[in-house]
Each structure stands twice: as structure tokens, then as C-alpha cells.
Amino acid sequence: MEVKVKKRVVVGLSGGVDSSVSALLLKQEGYEVIGLFMSNWDTIANFENNHEFNKTHQGCESELDYQDAQAVAQKIGIPLYRVEFIKEYWDNVFEYFLSEYQKNRTPNPDILCNQFIKFDSFLNYAKNELQADYIAMGHYARVKHDRNSSFLLKAIDTNKDQTYFLCNLNQNQLQNVLFPIGHLTKLQVRAIAKKHGLITANKKDSTGICFIGERNFKTFLQNYIPNQPGQIINIVNNQIIGHHIGTMYYTIGQRKGLNLGGMNERMFVCDKDIDKKIIYVAPSSFEKQYLISTQALIENINFIEPYNPQIPIMVRFRHRQDLIIVNDFLPIKNTKNVLINYESARAITPGQYAVFYQNDHCIGGGIVSKTNIGHQKVDFLVYKS
């Protein structure tokens, strides 16, 4: 990246190695770099009362990250500020997350976190309060700017590529963003951090829900959604074979944690009836019938750039999943929805995101509404009118 005039970049410094190296590289390239640490979750204000995290760590995980961010900022020689977007996160990300689980869908809060927090609230704060020309994040992605448009490209490190989580960004957001490590592999990023003595060089990658972190998922949800016990039924013979404490804790394709003993075959979750509080399971030998789909209705698609009908479209339903060929991409008139036919995919669930690619470009994504998995077949012709 050439820097003809000194531009101010505000980096989302999280206390992790990726954002640390992003800030370092920008400083080396001649930018005026400012670090900004976000706090977006408050365990007390957000009524998270029964998790071991509160009992043993007393909310210090975020503080430890902040201390690492401070150490990195001092080492690099940049100022570091701190900002809270707790209300914005609750209103735009977490309430949606809860509502989707109450509907027994499988949401992806990381996508909304990027859309509304990292690349909206953070961007606006950096622009308005810190007079930033750009913001930068430690995402494994690339952005290409031309005179009229910006394009989101896959990272060089395909195993770490995070464009899936950026599918809801718009042109205004991308035009103001830099991704300094998108051309590097994770090993290279750690090597750079180690070479320059950054405290985060060997720090493990963060996991769990965006800005909330690692939690026992059932225990965490119980803070906000009451248990709704019900039956587990074998869909093949309609026999009751177990019981559960809530359908929202299980996802399509799940095999672990079903607590079903004495079965001749391993069972997997294939459907859920919210009204009757039933989880349907099937034996592994029925996977093709009850888990494989070839067609889906995708709703509320965000296009980062217009798709080119002459270039093949690929889809990814999960982060790090292999790209799947889309045989038919059929926009539905007067909607932001599209019907897609694709090479077979396993355990695609309503609420997940379908993210579309053409060559190295991530062109956008939308939410899976329905699929044609076995017993869930839908007459999609109705959507073409």
C-alpha cells in the first residue's frame, strides 16, 4: 500500500495478534495510527447472572484483552483509546440473536456484529470523534478500491479467510476500510508479531460469540430464554426415544449431546417442531434423505457488488466450508430474495447465511429461509411469481 500523503487510520485493537500486526504494519507504512479498543458486552448490565465466568473471573477477560492492547500500543508507539458500544450491540446484534433462537433458527451474530458494530458504530466514532481517514481491522480479507467502487476479496490464507462474516457490508463501509493482513498467512502474522516483540505473538485466537466470548452455550442462553422441555422422536418410526430441555439448544445435523443410549446407529437431529416442542432425529443411514439439500430460498440478500451472469457463482453456507457450485441463481421479482440450485450440501439450516462468490470476489450474502431437505420439501415455484 503506497501512502502519498499521511493519512490517519484508526485500528480496532482487540488485544489479539491479528489486530496487533495490522497496527504495526500500518505504522511501518507511514500512516498516522490510532488504536481503539471496543467494549461491547457487560455481563452485569446484560443480566448474565448464572455463568461461571461471572463467579470466577468477575468480568476480567475483557480487561486482560485491554491490557494486552495497551502493551501493544505502547510497543508500537501509538495512542490507544477505549469506547463502549454496549447498547448498540444489544439493540442491533444480541436481540436479533435471541429472537432467531426463539424461532429455532441458527443465527450468525458475527455477521451482524461486523455490519452494525465494527463497520458502523466504530467507523462513525473513528470518523467523527477521531477524524479518521480510514479504519482498519485485523480481518483476513482484502479490499480493492477504484474510483467508483470497492470490492471485497478473499484473503490469501484461504483457511483463515473471513469474508463470509463481512457479506453484509456496503460500499460506504468498504470505501473507508483497510485490511492490512489480508495478503498474509496466519503463520506470517505470528512471525511478524514475534519478530517485533509483541506480547500477543503467541496468544490463542478468540472463539465463541462475537464480543461475548467462550461460554457454555446452554447455560448462557438460559439467562435469556426459559427451558421448554419436550420429546425426542425417531422420525423413521415415530417412536419416542428420549427427552430434551429445549429445541433451541439443538441444530440440524447435530450428533453429539443427544444423550440417546442403546441405539443401533448414531442418531442426528433432522427437524424440530417448535409448537409441539419435538426434536426429530434419524439414524445415520438416513443422512442422504434427511440432511442433504440441493435447493434453497435465500432472503434479504445484500449485494456488495452486482453479480455478473457470465461468471460462475459459488456459495458457502458456513465459515471455512468448501465453496459449492451454484447451478441456478434465480432472483425473485420485486424482492431481495433469490432461489438457488446447487451441488449437494449437508445440514443447511434456516437462519444461516449463504454467502456468494465470483472468482476471488465476495459479492454478498443473505439468510437461508427454506431448503429442500427430505421431509422439508417446499414448492418453490410459488416464489417465482
Swiss-Prot record:
Residues 160-162 are annotated as: Interaction with tRNA. ATP binds at G12, L13, S14, G15, G16, V17, D18, S19, M38, G138. One of its GO terms (molecular function) is ATP binding. InterPro entries: MnmA-like, MnmA-like_C, MnmA-like_central, MnmA-like_central_sf, Rossmann-like_a/b/a_fold. The active site is at C113, C210. It is an enzyme of class 2 (transferase). Disulfide bonds join C113-C210. GO terms for biological process: tRNA wobble position uridine thiolation. GO terms for cellular component: cytoplasm. Transmembrane segments: none annotated. It is found in: Cytoplasm. Its EC number is 2.8.1.13. The keyword Cytoplasm applies. It catalyses: S-sulfanyl-L-cysteinyl-[protein] + uridine(34) in tRNA + AH2 + ATP = 2-thiouridine(34) in tRNA + L-cysteinyl-[protein] + A + AMP + diphosphate + H(+). Belongs to the MnmA/TRMU family. HAMAP family: tRNA_thiouridyl_MnmA. This is tRNA-specific 2-thiouridylase MnmA. It comes from Ureaplasma parvum serovar 3 (strain ATCC 700970).
